[in-house]
Amino acid sequence: MSDIIAYKVDGEIVDTQSFKSLKNVKNAEEIYFDNSEDALKVIRHSCAHLMAQAILALYPNAKFFVGPAIEDGFYYDFRVTKENGEKLGKEDLQAIEKKMKEFIDAKEEIAKICSTKSEIANEFKNDDLKQEVLKRIPDGEVSVYKQGDFKDICRGPHVPNTKFLRFFKLTRVAGAYLGGDEKREMLTRIYGTAFADKENLNEYLRILEEAKKRDHRIIGNEMKLFTFDDQIGAGLPVWLPNGARMRSKLEKILFGVHRRRGYEPVRGPEILKADAWKISGHYTNYKENMYFTKIDEQEYGIKPMNCVGHIKVYQSEIRSYRDLPLKFFEYGVVHRHEKSGVMHGLFRVREFTQDDAHIFCMPSQIKENVLEILDFVDKIMKNFGFSYEMEISTKPEKAIGDDKVWEIATNALKEALDENGFKYGIDEGGGAFYGPKIDIKITDALKRKWQCGTIQVDFNLPSRFDLGYIDENNERKQPVMLHRAILGSFERFIGILIEHTAGELPFFIAPTGVSIIPINDAHLNYAKEVQKALANLEVDSEILSKNETLNKRIRTAEKGRVPMILVLGDNEVKNRSVALRDRRARAQSNLSLDEFLEFVKNKLNEVNF
């Protein structure tokens, strides 16, 4: 049996240092030193402190802000300058790791000391960053954790001894604004990870290296899909011809699926009066994420979501219960303010397009429509090779509507999943400000989880906009509004798909499906004939006929990760055939042109949405 490093009491993780002082504990669950989710939270949080201890030993002038455990590891934000006046860089990580290992070998006890806030403030009176931390802590008892000469204000939990922190790795150095405020100073942030054993650490590091090779920003540049430009602005992607072709194919496929499932296309404006956002609650609850402007002295907000426009479509006619459910969808371009430090390629941008839909239905229709959406999600994700899991996110601290309405909406989601045997987790407080939601989290080839699709049940916006329908008794009733996205956003989903496939995109959305390479000019007319036949199948192709060697042109096609390469020479022209290199199957073959076109048709028909 491995060592106990903490306990779980009433759903909260309590370290061994704190557990000793608890009284009348009835249901305490041991947390052992292993790679369970709870154990890793404790190990990684403690490793953040260990890193800070090492940094302080190497750089006595260092000041520390916060160092939490995060999903895949930990980080610490701090201020330090080296003797040459520079900030720490990646080249300094090895020395920090070496010092951390010294403290691990020393097997230092980690002690918890509790005191009053004023006493702690006095102890750290010369540390401006710790004073910033104290501002965020309510009055009362404050805890400090101590290991060796290092002390830090912290709630815990932590392992009891540094000996439990042997399997760690510092991964990267970044900058982070103090408290996430872009107007404050830039601190240094070092990220790391930790596990309970060497095997899991090595596997994580292997995946990390593979992720670098699959970085969608690098592959996107190699495949000429998209770019970013400082003159345009951060978080504003520019789609190049290859990327625009791929994206349009994805949009076209989804458009057809929506129509077959009974959705009506609509389109709302991208800029709305602030009055509309005040009614919806966005002005109060989401304003910091929005962009505003003035037109003729009237304040307008650029939409961060599409829901208000779809509400206005609903209100354009008198609705009957016979009309419901009404399903409106839109590829809606939205803008949200993201801090510069969190933007990352296509994953976090300021302008993006949602595959957004809103379903207006009667309360009795909630379950059937939620299940229809889940079936939609299942079809899409399986066609792209993703597995997924679901999580119900409940009422956040900042929300509109009363608790009773939230309870009804949350229970409607739970019942839809429970009655059909779906497994799901609970994310307490993770809902949208207007309603609870089901988050769809997909798992990629590197076993990373990404939140993409979402289903939200909303009683609040229909009430705020006084939506209604006439029921079978000729009485006016309020509909329920289901907010729904399958991909989440095209930008984010495409970024995930690029990394999931390492750029080897499915044939049906590949920007260029076939590269045609005539060996010399005598074969060019036949190449054009093949290209025309492919165009009739709606397959994009390119002819690589530059005055370059055959091998160089083949390498160009391979660098672009084109699924199929055709080499055309004298034999192919004479026999009306093609020499096919199938990149995805890693196979070469010779086919007649008719056989090849039939092969392409079959490839296109392999997916069924």
UniProtKB/Swiss-Prot annotation:
SMART domains for this protein: tRNA_SAD
Q: What is its EC number?
A: 6.1.1.3
Q: What cofactor is needed?
A: Zn(2+)
What compartments host this protein? Cytoplasm
State the Gene Ontology terms under molecular function: ATP binding; metal ion binding; threonine-tRNA ligase activity; tRNA binding
Alphabetized Gene3D superfamilies for the sequence:
3.30.54.20, Anticodon-binding domain, Bira Bifunctional Protein, Domain 2, Threonyl-trna Synthetase, Chain A, domain 2
**Its domain of life?**
Bacteria
Q: How is the cofactor bound?
A: Binds 1 zinc ion per subunit.
Into which family does the record put it? Belongs to the class-II aminoacyl-tRNA synthetase family.
The record's note on quaternary structure and interaction partners says:
Homodimer.
Q: What is this protein called?
A: Threonine--tRNA ligase
